[in-house]
């Protein structure tokens, strides 16, 4: 049996950009939430979130061992991906 190329298998309807975009090659987490994110968030949106997350961690001196820091980042991630108002790093300005 030969596999046919299905371009939609490599795209997702991105919840941030509200359009079909290339999907992440792998789930970002090895759990159900990671699978859900891979199916609803584009690779572009995820890369942008990782940049934001890094700035938030650095600026706020967050420890990934602290459950409160993890919860904060989870909340900010969901807001970012849903185009809601989220806490931005103070030194960050959006590209125009």
From Swiss-Prot:
Q: Where is this region: Disordered?
A: 21-40
Q: Which InterPro entries match?
A: Fe_traffick_prot_YggX (IPR007457), Fe_traffick_prot_YggX_sf (IPR036766)
One GO CC annotation: cytosol
Look up the signal peptide feature and give its range. none
What are this entry's molecular-function GO terms? Answer: iron ion binding
Q: Which GO terms describe its biological process?
A: cellular response to oxidative stress
Q: Which Pfam families match?
A: Iron_traffic
Q: Which UniProt keywords apply?
A: Iron
UniProt keyword annotation of Metal-binding present: no
Identify the NCBIfam families for this entry.
PRK05408.1 (NF003817)
Q: What does this protein do?
A: Could be a mediator in iron transactions between iron acquisition and iron-requiring processes, such as synthesis and/or repair of Fe-S clusters in biosynthetic enzymes.
Similarity comment: Belongs to the Fe(2+)-trafficking protein family.
Name the record gives this protein: Probable Fe(2+)-trafficking protein
Organism, scientific name: Psychrobacter cryohalolentis (strain ATCC BAA-1226 / DSM 17306 / VKM B-2378 / K5)
